[in-house]
Each structure stands twice: as C-alpha cells, then as structure tokens.
Amino acid sequence: MNDWTALTVTTTTEAIEAVSNILMEAGAVGIQIKDAADFKKETVDAHGTWFDPKTVPHLASGAQVIGYFDPATSLVEQRDHIATRVRGLAQFGLDPGAATVTLADVRQADWANVWKQYYHPLRVSRFLTIVPKWEHYTPQQAGELQLTLDPGMAFGTGTHPTTQLMLSLLESVIRGGETMIDVGTGSGILAIAAERLGVGDILATDVDEIAVRNAEANIKLNPVSHITVIANDLLKGITLSADLIVANILAEVLVPLIPQVRPRLKAHGHFLLAGIIANKATLIIRTLEDNGFSIAQRREAGGWVALDAVIKETA
C-alpha cells in the first residue's frame, strides 16, 4: 500500500501561494513547491538563502505545487474541481498558467524527510532570520531575531516577496509595545515576527480553520506568548482597536477590507498591506485614499507591492 497520494498542479510563480491554499483546503497534509524562479535568481542575496539550489533538481520554467494527501482521500472526484478553482484564480488577477492536475502514488520516505536537506536558515530582513524547525541555529550578529517555522506547511514560510516586503515594513514602523491585528495570518509568520520585534498584544485572524491550526503550531515553536489566533472573516465582528493592522492577502480581498480597517486603527497607527500585484497597486491606493488614508511608504520586489498607509491628517 502506498503511503501518500501526490497531487501536482502546474502553475506560475505568482499563483503558488493561492494554489497552496486550494490544496490545503482540499485536505493536503503537506505541500511541496517547485519554482523555476528560485533558480533564476542569484543563489545568495543580501540576506542569504533558504536552501542550496545547486543540489536540487529544478524546473526550467513555471512552477509546480504538490499536495500530499492520505491515500483514503478520494482525489479522482476532486481533481476536476481543483483544476477549476486554479483556473479561476485568473479572476483575481493571478496567472494560473497551465493549471494541469496530475496524481501519483508515493512512499512516505520519498517526501517526508528527504526534502528537508535542502532547507537552511534564511535571513529575510535586517533583523529577522527564518529557521526550519529541525535545524539548530546560532544568531550571527547582535540584534538578530530567529523565527522558527515548519516549511512543510502552506500559507507562507517567508520565501515569497510579499512576506519579505511585509517583514521589512514591520521593522520600519515597530517601536515597541504596540497592539496589532494580523488579518489573514496564514502561517502566523507576521504575528510571530511582530512580537519578536517588540509588539505587545496581537490578534491574528484567518478565515481558514487549517491556517488557524498551522499558525498555532508555528507559534508554539517560538518564544512568543501574546498572540491570540481565531477563525474570522477579515475584521467582521472585531471591536478592538490597534496601533498596527497588517494584511498580506490578494488585492481583491484588500478592497473590501480597507473600509473595515479605518474605524479599528488608532490615531497615528499604521495599516500595512501586501499581496498586491504591481498592476493592482493603483486600485488599492485609490481605495485607501477614498477611505481616508495616505501612503507613508511604498516598497516593491519581484513584481509585488507593499504599502504603509496612515490616516490622513485633517486641517
């Protein structure tokens, strides 16, 4: 009997996280990502590398997201539905690519441990280093902060430009002791990083129960104790106010979120947004301005945009 069924979606770099979420919602217990773009970049940038590309067989183009499922899961029936959802990402401005879906049986040893040899600590910003949970790591300089994560989980492990942009914005605005709401927390990486950087109480929300469980698992791997994770749809029903509100989600989800943020953000607070494809930035900025915000910072990387929005000062 085979230990796992692997469902592979052929897609594009920009759709990786969205496809990962689709597979997790379908019941995947683990996610593997193969992205040709990782091997087109320099192997070591200013902040190091998460894995050793020289040792990894890799794609020449495009990307593959592989979900690992219990063999008892009926994927033959789900395959067409998953393909339809992936193709539907186009309506959110994401290129789904070929959106082909294939199935294969694999043994436990083929994926559960072998892939770990390729993952190493990754310096993602001035102060933050992401470390896979099985690695022992000693900080390399004063002030360096370690974020321990399980990169086998979906919902963001720090390698995507949107996550790194958001982490750099957090470093730029945190002064210590703030309250924060993390909308669409995913892996919990932003909440964990924020507390490590000095934020006080943090409420992390996600509409997906699987993401909530993943965030809780990652939080337990880190020396943090002021993060509460709940399942919730954006800010609906949230009554508390915060100094920082962060959201690394698709532009189409940011648009309805923006009006919800204004009454929840304290005066002189910061609303940090990422997950914005460059061609959607104008839409998001216009929506922010229409809701009483101005742009304090704009950062870009890899075709993605992150924004630091503040409440407009009145004359």
From Swiss-Prot:
Keywords: Cytoplasm, Methyltransferase, S-adenosyl-L-methionine, Transferase. It is an enzyme of class 2 (transferase). Coiled coil: none annotated. It catalyses: L-lysyl-[protein] + 3 S-adenosyl-L-methionine = N(6),N(6),N(6)-trimethyl-L-lysyl-[protein] + 3 S-adenosyl-L-homocysteine + 3 H(+). InterPro entries: Ribosomal_L11_MeTrfase_PrmA (IPR050078), Ribosomal_PrmA_MeTrfase (IPR004498), SAM-dependent_MTases_sf (IPR029063). It is found in: Cytoplasm. One of its GO terms (molecular function) is protein-lysine N-methyltransferase activity. Disulfide bonds: none annotated. Belongs to the methyltransferase superfamily. PrmA family. Methylates ribosomal protein L11. This is Ribosomal protein L11 methyltransferase. It comes from Lacticaseibacillus paracasei (strain ATCC 334 / BCRC 17002 / CCUG 31169 / CIP 107868 / KCTC 3260 / NRRL B-441). The gene is prmA.
